[in-house]
């Protein structure tokens, strides 16, 4: 797994834990740093900050274009993967669109249900098509 792939996976862990514990993602990051004394990958921090700062808009896009799936109905891990993928796709110009989608699908293949990769690919693919109008 690439350094950015590991950073995505760690960001997913942080965001997932924060959601499950109803805690701040930054508190989760801080607690992890204190426990391990490890330096947090800068890209992990960038993802967490980006998703947290844009979560309302990201969730609105996901809710609007998920066709019959509310955020609450989605498995938690899928919801977090979609938030990361949407942030990379729409708000991180350093990541090519295709990479954002394929990395999100790869996380889903590893961490979620058999149906999740196809769902995530379809939803992020739709957002990719609509990207110019979504950011206008």
Swiss-Prot record:
Q: Which GO terms describe its molecular function?
A: RNA binding
Its recorded name reads: Transcription antitermination protein NusB
The Gene Ontology biological process annotation of the record reads: DNA-templated transcription termination; transcription antitermination
Record's PANTHER family? ANTITERMINATION NUSB DOMAIN-CONTAINING PROTEIN, N UTILIZATION SUBSTANCE PROTEIN B-RELATED
Q: List the NCBIfam families.
A: nusB
What role does it play? Involved in transcription antitermination. Required for transcription of ribosomal RNA (rRNA) genes. Binds specifically to the boxA antiterminator sequence of the ribosomal RNA (rrn) operons.
| Keywords from the named record | RNA-binding, Transcription, Transcription antitermination, Transcription regulation
Q: Name which cysteines form disulfide bonds.
A: none
One matching Pfam family is: NusB
User: Looking at the record's lineage, which domain of life comes first?
Assistant: Bacteria
Q: Which family does it belong to?
A: Belongs to the NusB family.
**According to its record, what are the GO cellular component terms?**
cytosol
UniProt keyword annotation of RNA-binding present: yes
């Amino acid at each position: 797994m690439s350094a950015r792939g590991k950073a995505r996976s760690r960001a997913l862990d942080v965001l997932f834990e924060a959601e499950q514990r109803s805690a701040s993602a930054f508190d989760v990051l801080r607690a992890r740093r204190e426990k391990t004394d490890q330096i947090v990958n800068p890209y992990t921090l960038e993802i967490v900050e980006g998703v947290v700062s844009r979560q309302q808009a990201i969730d609105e896009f996901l809710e609007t274009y998920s066709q019959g799936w509310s955020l609450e109905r989605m498995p938690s891990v899928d919801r977090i993967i979609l938030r990361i993928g949407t942030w990379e796709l729409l708000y991180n110009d350093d990541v090519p669109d295709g990479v954002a989608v394929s990395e999100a699908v790869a996380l889903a293949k590893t961490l979620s249900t058999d149906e999740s990769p196809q769902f995530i690919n379809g939803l992020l693919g739709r957002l990719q098509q609509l990207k110019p109008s979504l950011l206008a």
